[in-house]
Amino acid sequence: MINKENRYFYNALSNIQNQNYEKAIEDLIKVIELDEKNLDAYYNLARVYYDIKSYNKALKTYNKSIEIYPYDSEIYYNRAEVYIELNKFEEALKDLEKAISINKSFSDAYYLISVIFRKQKKYKKSIKYLKKVLETNGEDYIAYYDIYKLYNILIKHEKDETKKEKYLNIANKSLKKSANLGYEKAISRLK
């Protein structure tokens, strides 16, 4: 026999899948009322708030998740996404660094740091973190493509012809690697 808490929780998951977010929120709040330390309920509730762009509620709910269990790198990563939507980049960077301190090979966290630096037009720092993505996942063709794009931006702003040539060389190698990896992924999906 399934208990009340689980019934609400599984109903919430079904409602999330069907994009019936208001009902999912109601069900998740009921789960939390029955068990105020249910990390999965808080996590899913925060995700729903994020998906419906209710960022302040998402932030509050992620804060509660961290209070319950401060050792989950995903929660810090997800809270960083909320901070980015709120243009609170410093807070997002702190959360991403925390996520990485918990999980050193969290390539998505390195990638999101590169996104923040790109938004701030700190292109060399962005490239630095894309290279960290590739250290943890050398098959990430999107990271190679982003490196290509960022070096092309640097080329436009660089006066030194030697550096321009170096940047162009790196950009072209990155584009080629991205294309090759993307092609391989596409072929493997067709099989």
Regions found by a protein language model. Give the residues of each.
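Canonical positions in the second alpha-helix
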Residues: 30-31, 64-65, 98-99, 132-133, ...
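Helix-start (N-cap) detector for alpha-helical repeat units in TPR-like alpha-solenoids
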Residues: 5-6, 39-40, 73-74, 107-108, ...
